[in-house]
Amino acid sequence: MQIYQPHPWPLTVEEAITIQEELRHQVITEDQFTQPVQYVAGVDMGFEADGTISRAAVAVLSFPDLQVIETNLAYRPTSFPYIPGFLSFREIPAVLDALAKVQTKPDIILCDGQGIAHPRRLGIASHLGVLLNIPTIGVAKSLLIGKHEELADTKGSWQPLIHRGEIIGAVLRTRVGVKPVYVSSGHKISLPTAIDYVLRCTPKYRLPETTRVADKLASNR
């Protein structure tokens, strides 16, 4: 897969902030993709050798039946420290290496992390989407920023996630009696559509099947 918006990878937080502030203005939070969707992908990360080696996994699944079509792994030295709010700079270089091996181009990528639900509105899903010019969705297991009202226990229930008066995502129940996930637009997809695809990719478990397959690969399980 071709990188649409390449940039140098920063060595400092200050450089990373500059890149985030530049790229955030290129994020599109409206639906700009061809339907029907045929393939969805998940990306996830693992680390080896005390975090010095990054192991990125990508899984491409058919849609809507969610059968695994293709998986790939890529390894590279970790070049950026673990700092909340800047995880894309630590993870995306290896993710791009894994995606470069993909033969079946996905229509949408679901990322294990944030989209615009990020202090500078550029979490890993938005960052990756802008770089690849492809629709992406952030599906995070934990809250980074924002507040929301109490959520009903039924599957499919959701509440808007609000930060500084702006709706930046949704807290979404994907399974009855289980912790919710935090969904946000990554790139080229609206929040209602992102919620719809996340629900359609979570037929049995809390996390999307795309994430589950990629996580097993990245974790070497």
UniProtKB/Swiss-Prot annotation:
Any single GO CC term annotated in Swiss-Prot or TrEMBL for this entry: cytoplasm
Keywords per UniProt: Cytoplasm, DNA damage, DNA repair, Endonuclease, Hydrolase, Magnesium, Metal-binding, Nuclease
UniProt key word Nuclease: yes
A Pfam family reported for this protein in Swiss-Prot or TrEMBL: Endonuclease_5
Superkingdom field: Bacteria
UniProt record, GO biological process: DNA repair
EC identifiers of the protein: 3.1.21.7
Reaction(s) catalysed by this chain's protein: Endonucleolytic cleavage at apurinic or apyrimidinic sites to products with a 5'-phosphate
Residues annotated to bind Mg(2+): 44, 112
Cofactor: Mg(2+)
Marked site: Interaction with target DNA: 82
Subcellular location: Cytoplasm
Molecular function as annotated in GO: deoxyribonuclease V activity; magnesium ion binding; RNA endonuclease activity, producing 5'-phosphomonoesters; single-stranded RNA binding
Enzyme class: hydrolase
InterPro entries: Endonuclease-V
Entry function: DNA repair enzyme involved in the repair of deaminated bases. Selectively cleaves double-stranded DNA at the second phosphodiester bond 3' to a deoxyinosine leaving behind the intact lesion on the nicked DNA.
NCBIfam families hit by this protein: PRK11617.1
Family: Belongs to the endonuclease V family.
Protein name, entry field: Endonuclease V
